[in-house]
Amino acid sequence: PLSAFIIQRYTTRQVFLTGIIIFFLGTLLGGFSPNFTTLLIARIIQALGSGIMMPLMMTTILDIFEPHERGKYMGMFGLVIGLAPAIGPTLSGYLVEYINWRALFYVVAPISAVTFILALIFIKNVGVKVKAPIDILSIILSILGFGGMLYGVSSISQKGWNDPVVLSTIILGIIFVVLFIWRQERLETPLLSFKVFKNSQFTVGIAIMAVTMISMIGSETVLPMFVQNVLQRTPVDSGLILLPGAIVMAIMSIISGRLYETFGARVLSMIGMLIVTITTSYFVVMDEHTSTIVLATIYAIRMIGIALGLMPVMTHTMNQLTPELNAHGSSMTNTIQQVAGSIGTAGLVTILSVASQHFKPTPSDYQGMAKTEMMKHIQTDAMIHGYHSGFLFAVIITVVSLLLTFLLKRKKDLNEESH
């Protein structure tokens, strides 16, 4: 939430270069961490630096290009989003398996340094800056509210819903978020303006993106677990299975950006969400005999749907805002996607765990087996039942996203309103 204030108050170069420096320092600390506490602090520092990058990139696109030009450039934005999942899991899996976890930081550090040098040379300042006063109370409420919610939700998969720390941090987080919203409504220059929700199409778009992220991030977290735990493959294998899908999404993001300029968001998002619904349904019937080639193919087709459904909606949503609300819209989009992704991961992992624990085997399915063999089969079936339940949740969420696309306005109607 702080990114809107930072982007509006400071220049593009100041924000980007500072973000890269902070991320670089966090990366160095992570690589040389002597214990888990230091590693956790390093990851927080990294997040402080990288958290501003996506809203800054989106705001820059909105500031530079007119609404009718943004489709292809938002597609390039999607390319960046797609390439990270394409490279990250595969590279990290290889480094962890064949070197050690510190290598993750050693590889990223020089890339960060090169990025800083390139930014120093090429990045120019864009947009109009607003010298708004710093409201300390808003900053505190924002950190306590969104930080508490994210911590609580992300802890569900390890500690469960009934854990007092989880419940208290989520409840307190919600209370502080409500207080944060109340505070913003009373400030002349808010830290994060909630006026963006006065536009119904922006609200619908944000809802679609949030619901889609719940399904997308949740599935992307759980699918590698299925590959490793059920199919008995290595972390490198799980990364390679997801690699084609991430590459396809990166390419399709550019294509969908150009298609948006011709067809608008409504048609593309409907087709995209339908593809995602159908392909996610396949995950509900996977078992220990599932072919990794088939799984990789289905996942790649699913990512075509994600690219068609997500990027045009993102462009359509941001096009609804006036220039002075661009930074607030970008920050709101990024914040809600982060929260939704955490909810998706926590939701799927929790359902998976609970369903596995409550699996009731049918004795007739294991007749003639030795006790050791029978216990092994029951354990595998319990895991598969858990994964099926988790992915069924993802299917239901995706159907909700599909239904929401019907609330988007047609391109023809939007053109008539603009004239």
Predicted regions and their residues:
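Structural signature of transmembrane alpha-helices in multi-pass secondary transporters
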Residues: 23, 46-47, 75-85, 89, ...
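Helix-loop-helix hairpins in multi-pass membrane proteins, especially solute transporters
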Residues: 1-137
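Intrinsic disorder in cytosolic terminal tails and internal cytosolic loops
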Residues: 368-380, 408-419
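Select subsegments of transmembrane alpha-helices in polytopic membrane proteins
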Residues: 135-143, 269-271
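Residue-level hotspots within pore-lining transmembrane alpha-helices
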Residues: 29, 33, 45, 49, ...
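Helix-loop junctions on the cytosolic side of multi-pass membrane transporters
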Residues: 117-136, 182-191, 406-416
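12-transmembrane solute porter fold
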Residues: 8, 13-16, 20, 107, ...
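Membrane-interface helix caps and helix-loop-helix hairpins in membrane proteins
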Residues: 36, 127-132, 156-162, 288-289
